[in-house]
Every structure is written in structure tokens, then in C-alpha cells.
Amino acid sequence: MATKTKTQWTCNQCGATAPKWLGQCPGCHNWNSLVEEYVPQARSGTSSRSSTSAIALSSIELENESRIFIDHAGWDRILGGGVVRGSLTLLGGDPGIGKSTLLLQTAERLASQKYKVLYVCGEESVTQTSLRAKRLNISSPLIYLFPETNLDNIKQQIATLEPDILIIDSIQIIFNPTLNSAPGSVAQVREVTYELMQIAKSAQITTFIIGHVTKSGEIAGPRVLEHLVDTVLYFEGNSHANYRMIRSVKNRFGPTNELLILSMHADGLKEVSNPSGLFLQEKTGPTTGSMIIPIIEGSGALLIELQALVSSSPFANPVRKTAGFDPNRFSLLLAVLEKRAQVKLFTMDVFLSITGGLKIIEPAADLGALLAVASSLYNRLLPNNSIVIGEVGLGGEIRHVAHLERRIKEGKLMGFEGAILPEGQISSLPKEIRENFRLQGVKTIKDAIRLLL
């Protein structure tokens, strides 16, 4: 009698499983995200005995050449000082944002250092990929294109070519023929990534994987996909703008939350040497409702413009909208502004926007957001050319922020003359900054509002 094929229902967002179909995923609570997949049968007679033995940590010798430098300052920095041999890097982003372009340029830089690159172009033909390479002036003989989606054929090509670098474009199109599910399904993405990880670690092949993202901006596929790889990078930005951002959210071999800003040109992507200047280049002069705040992105500071608009509301329920700023935190801050500084906003529509399409979550932008709102409401400017730094507590107090010196140095570099900051942190700054940079300390949000009046 033939054995019955077992199936299970797996969430295509988080990878959670259930024995039967459910309308809502029990893991991530998304609706209609469970799909049916076959459960692979365990092989009979397999042994659980390990083929390796434990190794003393002190006896392991590290190679000095364990990292490969891409010869691109920004790329090497965001990867923690070059890419580690045998590592698996996942690059996720929206369609058409430039993921393939970026990795083709990366392949060219690595090939120029005599590394052999295998580029698996599963989504495009060889002709389409070569046309893009020609536009980017890429013609290295050490870059090999392989238009294939079958994992078995890819593994055979890897064994034949023995590349140093492997690029998969993209993971959602590659399939394992031993599984009875469609390419891009939870089971396929999980198993294909696992096998690529095994190949990368055993053969010391540095691997880059391109992944699609969902509507919410997360990499499509099971959450285990991000756990399997060594580095997760998000490629962000507006496809209608000429700049892109790469943000590291996971890195086993370096720091996380690093940010790399690139500009799109006819011949590919190039690093922006002065990111603060990029986001402030269209600011013509002092404007009510506008504040400049320094935020920390990875190991560097970045100046951005925060704009607020306050107008009378014709409706009983005023509108509160944000772009690039957490709306829940903004509602909380407006409540603090009304309660602690007696700024009446209950009949006003309030809008807040981060210019350039950036998204910020750090609390050091609190004070800048509230001063921008007050500036728009009272139609008053800050008296000096200053940046604004500070977290606002529920009691209206201005709280300390991290990396204050780094933020102020970035403001000084960009030509600003002073800063509004927590009063209690002024004494911790170096003497040079205290003497050569105008510092205005504030204890409460009410003190900060007085600077406008």
C-alpha cells in the first residue's frame, strides 16, 4: 500500500506552520497568507551520528585574508570591512530599484581583482543581462553568466567552474526539483537558501543573493531566510529619485544599521560622498516650520530637514499626518506639547515630513519635530542658524541623547553656527566645541518654545 503524502500549511510571510488551513496566521497574524506544501519524507536508514568532532576554540587559526575587499569604500564599510569568504549576503529591495545593477558593478570590481564570478541570472536572459553590462561598461572575462533556475544545474555549474564569487538573481525564482512546490514558495525559498549556504560554507564561495520584498517592505519568504544568511541588506529609495540607500539590518561579521547612500547615473550607481549636503541641497534659506536635525546612521551622523505645517482645520476631528516619522510617537509628542507647553493644537491640522523620503525612528528627533510644529504655528523662525537635538519625555523634559559630539561635529562641518540641545549635556562636550560653537541648552519643551517667541 502506497504511503500517503503528508501536507502542511505554511505562512508565506513568517514561515509558521499549521496542520490545516487557517484564515489568519497564528505567527504573524497576516490574513490569507497560509499556503499548502508537501512535507518531505525522512530517508530511511539515515544515521544521526555526527561526521565531525568538537574543536578547541584556542586551536582555530584565522587567515589574514579571510575578507575580500570590494574596492569600494562604502560597500566595504557597510559589510564591516570587506565581505567575508564563504559568507552569504542577502540584498532585498523593490523591483527596478537597482539591485541587479549594483551587483553587476560589484562583480566587475571583484573580477578586476582576479576573482572568478558566476552570475546566475534566473530572471533575465543572457542577452538582457549583457545589455545592462554593456551600458555599465562591464566586460570582464572573469564574469560568467548562467541563465538557470534549476538548483541542480546551478550546483553542477558551480562544481565545474569553481567560482570565487556567486551571485543569485533572484532567490525567489530558483527551485529545487525534488520539492513538489512552485518556485518562490516558502518551502522552495527555505530549502534553496539552505543548500546555497551549505555550498558557500563548504567550498568557501562568497555568495550574494537578491531577494524581493513584500508590500510592507520586508524580504519576501519565510523569516528563516534572514536567519540562514550572514548579512541582510535592504536596498531602499524612491525609484523616481536619483539616489538609493543600502541599510544593513543584520551582519554577523560587522556592525549593523550602517547606511550607504548612492546616486543613480547613466553608467550605474555611485557613492554620495556628502550625504548631508544631498538632503540639504534644496534648502534655500530659513523657513518657518523647518528644522535641521542630526541623526545617527551606523557609524556616521547625517543632517536632514524636518518640515511641519500647521493650519486651521475645517473639521471637528483635525488631521494629523506624518511622512517618514512614526505617527504614534508624533501623536504622543503633540500631546506633550499641548499639556506641558500650553500650545493649543486641538483645532489645527498638523503635518510632519522628513525631506528626501528618509524614515527615522530615533528619539533624538523629538525636539526638532516639536519646534518645527511650533515654528509653523506661530510663524516664527529660530533666531540663529542652529541644529536641534533632544529627546522629549512625557513630563516635557529634554532628555540626553547618544553620540552628541558626533552630531554637533557634522552640523559644524555643514556650516551651522549653533545647536539647541539638552542643557545637562553641555558640560560633557569638549572645550573646543563649547568655545567655538554656540550652544543653547534647554531643560524643558517650554524653554525651547520660548526661543521662538
UniProtKB/Swiss-Prot annotation:
GO MF annotation list: ATP binding; ATP hydrolysis activity; ATP-dependent DNA damage sensor activity; damaged DNA binding; zinc ion binding
Organism superkingdom: Bacteria
Residues spanned by motif RadA KNRFG motif: 250-254
Broad EC category: hydrolase
Family annotation (InterPro entries): AAA+_ATPase, DNA_repair_RadA, P-loop_NTPase, RecA_ATP-bd, Ribosomal_Su5_D2-typ_SF, Ribsml_uS5_D2-typ_fold_subgr, Rubredoxin_2
Residues in C4-type zinc fingers: 11-28
Entry GO CC: cytosol
PROSITE patterns per UniProt: RECA_2
EC number annotated for this UniProt entry: 3.6.4.-
GO biological processes: recombinational repair
Residues reported to bind ATP: G93, D94, P95, G96, I97, G98, K99, S100
Region (Lon-protease-like): 349-453
Keyword terms, alphabetized: ATP-binding, DNA damage, DNA repair, DNA-binding, Hydrolase, Metal-binding, Nucleotide-binding, Stress response, Zinc, Zinc-finger
Task of the protein: DNA-dependent ATPase involved in processing of recombination intermediates, plays a role in repairing DNA breaks. Stimulates the branch migration of RecA-mediated strand transfer reactions, allowing the 3' invading strand to extend heteroduplex DNA faster. Binds ssDNA in the presence of ADP but not other nucleotides, has ATPase activity that is stimulated by ssDNA and various branched DNA structures, but inhibited by SSB. Does not have RecA's homology-searching function.
Record remark: domains: Has a putative N-terminal zinc-finger, a middle region with homology to RecA with ATPase motifs including the RadA KNRFG motif, while the C-terminus is homologous to Lon protease.
Family label: Belongs to the RecA family. RadA subfamily.
Protein's UniProt name: DNA repair protein RadA
Gene field: radA
